[in-house]
């Protein structure tokens, strides 16, 4: 029937749109591995996609919206891993939760890099519609961490769990620079005799999560 043909055509269009969005996001991620944020432009992205730069504007209005979709995808992957841990961990305590946070986030260094380096600019230059979609994705991760904490420390009430989240999530914005020290930064710190330590992403997260979890107690 005409209705069925129309529905099938709509499904094909949706799949094609999603595939093209993914291709653009993948190209952005590929460029960001070797280029600075300011050098990743829609023109550069267009050079490594199968369609023209002009066509990119059918899917994203600014390069910041592409980055927003990229970090949104990263947050979704993190949430997937957290939900899997929630389903698989029969017994969970605070020490194991710190390990889970460290393991799952150390697999998402791209997300941590964008969070610490460019997030304000990305949000500022994205539409309210795109930003709303991202905040929904971010909220899912927030809820996953809350659910894991509720399972690991059932004695904590919602206010105490929220206090942990409002310490841990801001910390995430600062992880990357402490784990990716450039030669220039290293030389400057050596010049002033600054005794610094370079941590792996996993070690820094596990250590900080353990400290925050140890200090999280039920609200009076």
Task: Specify the residue positions occupied by each region the protein language model found.
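Amphipathic alpha-helical segments used for helix-helix packing
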Residues: 107-132, 183-188
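Single conserved hydrophobic/aromatic residue that forms the stacking wall/gate
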Residues: 1-9, 13
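Alpha-helical structural segments
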Residues: 19, 23-30, 48, 65-85, ...
């Amino acid at each position: 029937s005409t209705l069925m043909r129309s529905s099938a055509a709509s499904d094909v269009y949706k799949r094609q749109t999603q595939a093209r969005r993914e291709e653009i996001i993948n190209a952005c991620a590929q460029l960001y591995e070797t280029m600075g944020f300011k050098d990743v432009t829609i023109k550069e992205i267009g050079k490594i996609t199968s369609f023209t730069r002009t066509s990119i504007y059918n899917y994203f209005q600014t390069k910041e919206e592409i980055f927003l979709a990229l970090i949104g995808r990263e947050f979704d992957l993190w949430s997937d891993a957290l939900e899997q841990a929630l389903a698989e961990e029969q017994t969970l305590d605070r020490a194991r939760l710190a390990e889970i946070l460290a393991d799952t986030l150390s697999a998402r260094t791209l997300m941590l890099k964008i969070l610490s380096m460019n997030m304000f600019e990305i949000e500022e230059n994205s539409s309210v519609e795109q930003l709303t979609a991202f905040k929904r994705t971010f909220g899912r991760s927030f809820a996953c961490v809350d659910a894991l904490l509720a399972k690991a420390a059932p004695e904590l009430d919602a206010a105490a769990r929220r206090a942990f989240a409002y310490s841990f999530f801001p910390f995430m914005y600062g992880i990357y620079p402490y784990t990716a020290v450039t030669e220039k930064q290293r030389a400057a710190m050596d010049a002033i005799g600054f005794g610094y330590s370079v941590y792996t992403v996993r070690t820094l997260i596990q250590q900080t999560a353990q400290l925050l979890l140890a200090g999280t107690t039920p609200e009076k």
